[in-house]
Amino acid sequence: MVNVPKTRKTYCKGRECRKHSQHKVTQYKAGKSSLFAQGKRRYDRKQSGFGGQTKPVFHKKAKTTKKVVLRLECVVCKTKAQLALKRCKHFELGGDKKQKGQALQF
């Protein structure tokens, strides 16, 4: 269980700052993939018509988790940076701090 606070004071690479300042933390989420990327256009063209599946479908998945990526936005200059954390099964943003001697809760 990884619990990350919603704000953190860290170095800002922005041209105005270039010093440690407060950052707002959110979790990175991949955007919607474009239908007009060259590979997708080629794939759709190949798939159309008769003949079933034309390219191999990947089945040998090895990983059970993904790396968590944090998106840090500077409060002063609004510059965004990304920071990758280690792999974890449970990730929490701004959760309660854990007390000593209490059971884990998901």
UniProtKB/Swiss-Prot annotation:
InterPro entries: Ribosomal_eL44 (IPR000552), Ribosomal_LSU_eL42 (IPR053708), Ribosomal_zn-bd (IPR011332). The keyword Cytoplasm does not apply. The keyword Protein biosynthesis does not apply. Keywords: Ribonucleoprotein, Ribosomal protein. It holds the Pfam family Ribosomal_L44. It comes from the Eukaryota. One of its GO terms (molecular function) is structural constituent of ribosome. One of its GO terms (cellular component) is ribonucleoprotein complex. GO terms for biological process: translation. SUPFAM superfamilies: Zn-binding ribosomal proteins (SSF57829). PANTHER family: 60S RIBOSOMAL PROTEIN L36A/L44. Belongs to the eukaryotic ribosomal protein eL42 family. Cycloheximide sensitive type. This is Large ribosomal subunit protein eL42P.
